[in-house]
From Swiss-Prot:
UniProt name for this protein: Bifunctional enzyme CysN/CysC
Residues covered by region (Sulfate adenylyltransferase): 1-472
Entry keywords, A to Z: ATP-binding, GTP-binding, Kinase, Multifunctional enzyme, Nucleotide-binding, Nucleotidyltransferase, Transferase
Reported function: With CysD forms the ATP sulfurylase (ATPS) that catalyzes the adenylation of sulfate producing adenosine 5'-phosphosulfate (APS) and diphosphate, the first enzymatic step in sulfur assimilation pathway. APS synthesis involves the formation of a high-energy phosphoric-sulfuric acid anhydride bond driven by GTP hydrolysis by CysN coupled to ATP hydrolysis by CysD.
Source organism phylogeny: Bacteria, Pseudomonadati, Planctomycetota, Planctomycetia, Pirellulales
Xref: CDD domains: APSK (cd02027), CysN_ATPS (cd04166), CysN_NodQ_II (cd03695), CysN_NoDQ_III (cd04095)
Length: 647
């Protein structure tokens, strides 16, 4: 129901425009059985005068007939619409309710509290911005409270209100001590969850205490009422406006002169003229038009439904994804995810399911189950399978790559569901994890062999023989610095000098590696680590062949640089810091990457939106803003001579 306004009678167009511009907040109520979730929502609507008269009369009549509340009406009947729900006094399915106030529009999902309906609760929470977790003041924090809190955290809901309900009950009597006791108990559990914005409000849902109006029965509470908090909580920063993702739903071809790619923007912003990449083909083009039902736009953002036309004829179809060229998602056929199992039939490791991800559907199987989670204490337990409503971490092996982001970063492109191929039933909901997230799967760095296990150990040609043939010792020189510092220019100049001197040398350029070996990686810290690991392997292989390798890479993490040194061999690994100042790097930026990073269009960009660890003890430091490229190259050559790699 909409907020009543005088504009409805005087200027309906102005009212509709005002209503259209209100921000929408989606929230859920959850908690254990009979904690008062439906009662809370019903009373919230009633006290806000957002209930129709005929609906109120029906609820009052049903309250008298059922006798569910002594001496008054039962607000929960506004939400429990199923006959079984009203007869049993419980919520079975998710009930959605829309209403608005003068400040904001709301969509409420009233979720069931019984354990057997946990899957229904997870469904309601999947699109919520905020969660209200109810706790009965008599019973405190229960197992189902913990279960729902864990799911709320798992599904990335950042804003949580713990509403301690039934403060009016005999034995509680609006006690501040009891409220504080429950808050402390919940906090001790919540410290192990990712709940960054947590608030506590004492309420009586049946009587309306601290819902819309401040309670006279609890003068010791000086915080916000529930409605005031819902109207004012800031959710703007929750939106991902950096990573542009458009899963293609269909190709619109109404005539020979128009070909557009339709879909709902999952995240980010796109503008006319910007370069895009279509996955998985990796073809590039530029946005020609952004077409919508209401006319063409110069820019569009999530969650608008748009049709993009491109400057070039590119082959794309449903299941493909259009992204900004400088910000690619991961494209992988092996992913790790947390699953909420939602089917009566237990999960079967190795069984093939259909994995639905955005507009893409691919067959896949659960390769391994790392552990399941005991929601009562959050301990991880080994298990052969997942039963109904259980939660666990799995590794999925898919028949084709999916283009995804970690769920923590992008709730749309990080979400999957598993479907039974025979019954077509949804059996699980999954949240894709970031590479390297704590779990049973080791970091790929942990699997690295030592330099003693190099290909040289299997070759009939020894390192010494290669050194004698080439007249040099193999080495890798890592030139690290910010984008635009001059790393690659110096590497190419050194290559020329060494080659002209009769040396065998090769350059590993970061952009070259990104187009080949690391084309499936993005630019998160984990992806940069993996990119450097692969580049390190390439450099190590070149060293095994007797070559001097010049690796030009940003390599922002000091920890990862040290790992590369161990991978290659510290006795043949040199670090050159190209210490060109940031302001000079910005001036040299011909691709506009720094400007995009400043505008929030490029995430994890070293020097702007991500940290660059300045090498503390490099073998050489040069400043390409005060020293010419040729002089920098000479310094690198002298370093190689000083270390004995060349004469």
């Amino acid at each position: 129901m909409s907020h009543q306004s005088d504009l409805i009678a005087t200027d309906i167009d102005a009212y509709l425009k005002q209503h259209e511009q209100k921000q929408l907040l989606r929230f859920i109520t959850c908690g254990s059985v009979d904690d008062g979730k439906s009662t809370l929502i019903g009373r919230l609507l009633y006290d806000s005068k957002l209930v129709y008269e005929d609906e109120l009369a029906k609820v009052q009549s049903d309250s008298v007939r059922q006798g569910s509340v002594a001496g008054g009406f039962d607000p929960s009947l506004f939400m429990d619409g199923l006959k079984e729900e009203r007869e049993q006094g419980i919520t079975i399915d998710v009930a959605y309710r829309y209403f608005s106030t003068a400040k904001r529009k709301f969509i409420i999902a009233d979720t069931p509290g019984h354990e057997q309906y946990t899957r229904n609760m997870a469904t309601g929470a999947s699109s919520a911005d905020l969660a209200i977790i109810l706790i009965d003041a008599r019973h405190g924090v229960l197992t189902q409270t913990r279960r729902h809190s864990f799911i709320v955290s798992l599904l990335g809901i950042r804003h949580v209100v713990v509403a301690v309900n039934k403060m009016d009950i005999d034995g509680v009597d609006y006690s501040e001590d009891r409220f504080n006791e429950i808050c402390d108990d919940y906090r001790s559990f919540a410290t192990r969850l990712d709940l960054p914005d947590l608030h506590f409000i004492p309420i009586s849902a049946l009587n309306g205490d601290n819902l819309v109006d401040r309670s006279e029965n609890m003068p010791w509470y000086t915080g916000s009422t529930l409605m005031n908090f819902l109207e004012t909580v800031y959710i703007g920063s929750d939106r991902n406006l950096q990573d542009f993702r458009l899963p293609v739903q269909l190709v619109n071809r109404p005539n020979l002169n128009f070909r557009g790619f339709c879909g709902t923007i999952a995240s980010g912003i796109i503008r006319k003229g910007e370069e895009i990449t279509v996955l998985p083909s990796r073809q590039k083009s530029k946005v020609k038009e952004i077409v919508t039902y209401d006319g063409n736009l110069d820019e569009a953002y999530a969650p608008l439904a748009v049709t993009l036309t491109l400057e070039d004829e590119i082959d794309a179809s449903r299941g493909d994804m259009i992204v900004r060229s400088g910000n690619l998602p991961r494209s992988e056929s092996d992913v790790e995810a947390m699953l909420v199992w939602m089917n009566e039939e237990a999960m079967v490791p190795g069984k093939t399911y259909l994995v639905k991800h955005s507009t893409q559907t691919v067959p896949g199987n659960v390769e391994t189950l790392a552990y399941k989670v005991d929601v009562n204490d959050l301990h991880r337990m080994p298990a052969p399978t997942l039963e109904l409503n259980e939660i666990g971490r799995v590794r999925l092996s898919l028949s084709a790559p999916i283009h995804h982001d970690p769920y923590r970063r992008n709730r749309t492109t990080g979400a999957i569901i598993l479907v039974d191929r025979i019954t077509n039933a949804t059996v699980a909901a999954g949240m894709i994890l970031d590479r390297g997230t704590t779990g049973s799967h080791k970091s790929v760095w942990d699997d690295e062999v030592s330099t003693d296990d190099s290909s040289d150990a299997l070759s009939t040609v020894t390192t010494e023989e290669r050194a004698a043939r080439f007249g040099q010792k193999p080495a890798t020189v890592l030139l690290t610095g910010l984008t635009g510092s001059g790393k690659t220019s110096i590497a190419r100049a050194v290559e020329r000098k060494l080659f002209d001197a009769g040396r065998s040398v090769a350059v590993v350029d970061g952009e070259f590696v990104r187009r080949g070996l690391s084309r499936d990686l993005g630019f998160s810290a984990d992806d940069r680590s993996e990119n450097l690991r692969r580049s390190g392997h390439l450099a190590h292989t070149l060293n095994d062949a007797g070559l001097i390798c010049l690796a030009s890479l940003v390599a922002p993490s000091d920890d990862v640089r040290q790992k590369v040194g161990k991978l290659i061999g510290e006795d043949q690994f040199l670090v050159v810091h190209v210490a060109t100042p940031l302001d000079v790097c910005r001036e040299r930026d011909t691709k506009g990457q720094y400007a995009k990073a400043d505008a929030g269009e490029l995430s994890n960009f070293p020097g702007v939106t991500a940290k660059y660890d300045v090498p503390t003890n490099p073998d050489l430091a040069v400043d390409a803003s005060t020293t010419s490229i040729a002089e920098c190259a000479d310094a690198v050559v002298e370093l190689l001579k000083l270390k004995g790699f060349i004469k």
